[in-house]
Amino acid sequence: MQTNGRILVVQPELYATTIGVFENERFLYKQTIQHNEEELSKFTRIMDQVAYRKQTLLHQLDLDGINISKFSAVCGRGGLLQPITGGTYAVNDKMLYDLKTASYGEHVSNLGAVIADSIAKGLNIPAYIVDPPVVDEMQSIARISGIPEIERKSIFHALNHRQAGRLASKRLGKNYNELNLIVIHIARGITIGAHNKGKIIDVTNGLEGEGPFTIDRSGGIPIARFLRYGIDKFDQIEDWEQKLIKQSGLKGYLHTEDPKVIQLNLLKKDPWTMEIMQALAYQIAKEIGSMSTVLHGEVDGIVFTGNVEDDDFVMKEVITRINWIADVMVFPGNNELEAMNEGVLQVIRGEIPVKVYP
């Protein structure tokens, strides 16, 4: 049984690709490759970017003296697949087909497994994904939406949620599988989940309009009023979707999505900016309160992760509203590279079985 591994992890983002190299648990190398928006606009579909992104990251590794022949596995960020349980999955043909055809939606995360597989095949080593955003451990009662034909879906920042939960459990000196936690991931999308003894039994779907509004997403809205608003404005379903997930939130209210501009306006105590940011904090706090009822009020900790350092005003506003529920822990930044490496190491060492999609 292999106990050691040098692992390449690949994290595609909207206008960047972040890569990391690990020797077992040791973080050897990290680089974020920025992609020019104009360059990416040449590609009709997100999946058309695979060769370009692969070439740029391999070129970067070569420039930085990283010998790719030493890798024992490649791990890509998981994408939009059919609902699956958490764990480490080997990349296979069915997974690649679903990602390449956008069978369950088009998103930049779909590139992760495809790029990882392409690199791995050239090196004759395995490719994996870990805890993709479609991890579905929701209890059956949480799936009921109110419309029989529409079931709630689990789409969220599963990888960082789970990693933040594990970090919190270490701080509390307990096993993650023994705790009840509420985890909040703050990024371009915000997702809030109820972690019940290792299972994420309910979570806001940050991609399809649940939870609080975000930088450019609407969050939950009055549906009937939105339908009346859009009936004369939108011709295609894509227009409706664009309004919900790319033209609303802070971008819609403040006409900017630049955190520096927003922070400057907060320092100036601009009344409109302050009101909108207070509303964002209010909505986040309200969802946290909702998740506490999912856990019957038995909450061992409330855990924040993601871009929390960019939202000091919002964080303070949220914490004053929810710190009566449980102790608050904050783990700034994105720990997804470490989480992917950990998931692959566990498989390499035989600590957990590799899962097969679907």
Curated annotation (Swiss-Prot):
SUPFAM superfamilies: Actin-like ATPase domain (SSF53067). It catalyses: butanoate + ATP = butanoyl phosphate + ADP. Keywords: ATP-binding, Cytoplasm, Kinase, Nucleotide-binding, Transferase. It comes from the Bacteria. One of its GO terms (biological process) is acetate metabolic process. Its main location: cytoplasm. Its EC number is 2.7.2.7. Gene3D superfamilies: 3.30.420.40. InterPro entries: Aliphatic_acid_kin_short-chain (IPR000890), ATPase_NBD (IPR043129), Butyrate_kin (IPR011245). GO terms for molecular function: acetate kinase activity; ATP binding; butyrate kinase activity. The keyword DNA repair does not apply. It is found in: Cytoplasm. GO terms for cellular component: cytoplasm. NCBIfam families: butyr_kinase, PRK03011.1-5. Belongs to the acetokinase family. PANTHER family: ACETATE KINASE, BUTYRATE KINASE 2-RELATED. This is Probable butyrate kinase. It comes from Oceanobacillus iheyensis (strain DSM 14371 / CIP 107618 / JCM 11309 / KCTC 3954 / HTE831). The lineage of its organism: Bacteria, Bacillati, Bacillota, Bacilli, Bacillales. The gene is buk.
